[in-house]
């Protein structure tokens, strides 16, 4: 599976997901599913591998989820071509360098469509200046081979970055080039081509919007920055510090002046909106000034908690992106009492797996 993909089954697995999603949504009177496919291979922009040492040899491995057996991975067609090229080049360079290979147990890759890559080397040992010198030489060698690479070393309570711990992605979204800073070890959408389709779908279903947009869990601003052109103003919340910093950078780089990011959890924001308590982080922002008629949510796999469901149902339109249709359905049992589903989409973020990413637009009855 890891060294080859059953590309001949791509369409049939997508059809099966489409039928499954349509059945799940039938109790909620959902319209027909709009389907957005993925490239059949080289679609995943990040990958993590354990490293196996066998005498002088060194190779990437993964573990079979059922048998737990290790699988040697020399090529990984799931991942971007850039990751595949780097996998080969990197191991060729470090296998003869004891400082770089000793107790190396994992390598993480994060690549972009803009042809940049971050490589994180994880060790079960202390890494120091000697490691840094060797890693710097390694990076220069890889740059000379044509790679635009950031190299990071990680060990217990240690992180050494040779230059930056981020890369800037450029995505073409509905005729505009959007710049997104992606930070190592922070969440980014794994399938860039499908992410573009998700952003364009969200833009199309919110065309001719009135009022402002509220977004919970905004990450690096992936959706809020793309959607800013459809709304007067956007107010977005995010809890993770690196993501908030990346979002602020992305706002500046994309010359967007109508988006405000607040660092707080969806739960705290719910309390602030309901006037339960005041928060220092909201100083200078009067929530009453915003006329948010649309709310956008892209929650974790667990879905929206009860209090957030109570918050979102107050909005005329709810745009909900879900990476777990089961928890979406649980939330819909409440939301369907006040709203109807006007749009339904399936995004094949994770081909050849049972995972489904979907989007619904709910409008007040």
Swiss-Prot record:
EC code: 2.1.1.-, 2.1.1.35
Transmembrane parts of this sequence: none
Broad EC category: transferase
Keywords from the named record: Methyltransferase, S-adenosyl-L-methionine, Transferase, tRNA processing
GO biological process: tRNA methylation
One Pfam short name: tRNA_U5-meth_tr
GO CC entries: cytosol
Residues noted as binding S-adenosyl-L-methionine in the record, renumbered to the chain: 189, 217, 222, 238, 298
Entry-linked InterPro entries: MeTrfase_TrmA_AS, MeTrfase_TrmA_CS, SAM-dependent_MTases_sf, TrmA_MeTrfase, U5_MeTrfase_fam
GO molecular function per UniProt: rRNA binding; tRNA (uracil(54)-C5)-methyltransferase activity, S-adenosyl methionine-dependent; tRNA binding
Reactions the enzyme catalyzes: uridine(54) in tRNA + S-adenosyl-L-methionine = 5-methyluridine(54) in tRNA + S-adenosyl-L-homocysteine + H(+); uridine(341) in tmRNA + S-adenosyl-L-methionine = 5-methyluridine(341) in tmRNA + S-adenosyl-L-homocysteine + H(+)
UniProt-annotated catalytic positions: 323, 357
Family: Belongs to the class I-like SAM-binding methyltransferase superfamily. RNA M5U methyltransferase family. TrmA subfamily.
PANTHER family reported for this sequence: TRNA/TMRNA (URACIL-C(5))-METHYLTRANSFERASE, TRNA_TMRNA (URACIL-C(5))-METHYLTRANSFERASE
HAMAP family in the record: RNA_methyltr_TrmA (MF_01011)
Record function comment: Dual-specificity methyltransferase that catalyzes the formation of 5-methyluridine at position 54 (m5U54) in all tRNAs, and that of position 341 (m5U341) in tmRNA (transfer-mRNA).
Designated name of the protein: tRNA/tmRNA (uracil-C(5))-methyltransferase
Species of the source: Proteus mirabilis (strain HI4320)
Underlying gene: trmA
């Amino acid at each position: 599976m890891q060294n080859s993909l059953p590309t001949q089954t791509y369409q049939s697995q997508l059809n099966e997901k489409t039928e499954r999603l349509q059945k799940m949504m039938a109790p909620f009177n959902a319209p027909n599913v709009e389907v957005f496919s993925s490239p059949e291979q080289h679609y995943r922009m990040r990958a993590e591998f354990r490293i196996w040492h066998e005498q002088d040899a060194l190779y990437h491995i993964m573990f079979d989820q059922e048998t737990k057996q290790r699988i040697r991975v020399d090529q990984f067609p799931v991942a971007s071509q850039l990751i595949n090229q780097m996998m080969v080049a990197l191991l060729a360079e470090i296998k003869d360098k004891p400082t770089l290979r000793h107790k190396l147990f994992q390598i993480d890759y994060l690549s972009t469509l803009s042809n940049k890559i971050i490589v994180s080397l994880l060790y079960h040992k202390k890494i120091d200046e000697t490691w840094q010198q060797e890693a710097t030489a390694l990076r220069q060698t890889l740059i000379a081979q044509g790679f635009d690479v950031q190299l990071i070393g990680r060990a217990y309570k240690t992180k050494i970055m040779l230059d930056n711990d981020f890369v800037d992605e450029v995505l073409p979204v509905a005729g505009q080039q959007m710049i997104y800073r992606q930070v190592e070890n922070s969440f980014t959408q794994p399938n860039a081509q499908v992410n573009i389709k998700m952003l364009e779908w969200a833009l199309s279903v919110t065309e001719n919007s009135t009022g402002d947009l509220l977004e919970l869990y905004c990450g690096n601003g992936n959706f809020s920055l793309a959607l800013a052109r459809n709304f007067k103003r956007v107010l977005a919340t995010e809890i993770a510090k690196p993501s908030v910093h990346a979002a602020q950078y992305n706002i500046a780089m994309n010359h967007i002046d109508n988006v405000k990011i607040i660092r707080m959890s969806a739960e705290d924001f719910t309390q602030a909106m309901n006037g339960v308590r005041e928060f220092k982080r909201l100083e200078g922002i009067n929530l009453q000034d915003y006329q948010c008629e649309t709310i956008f949510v892209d929650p974790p796999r667990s879905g929206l908690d009860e209090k957030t469901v109570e918050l979102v149902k107050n909005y005329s339109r709810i745009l909900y992106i879900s990476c777990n249709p089961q928890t979406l359905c649980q939330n819909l049992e409440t939301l369907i009492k006040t709203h109807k589903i006007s749009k339904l989409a399936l995004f094949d973020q994770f081909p050849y797996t049972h995972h489904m990413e979907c989007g619904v637009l709910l409008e007040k009855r």
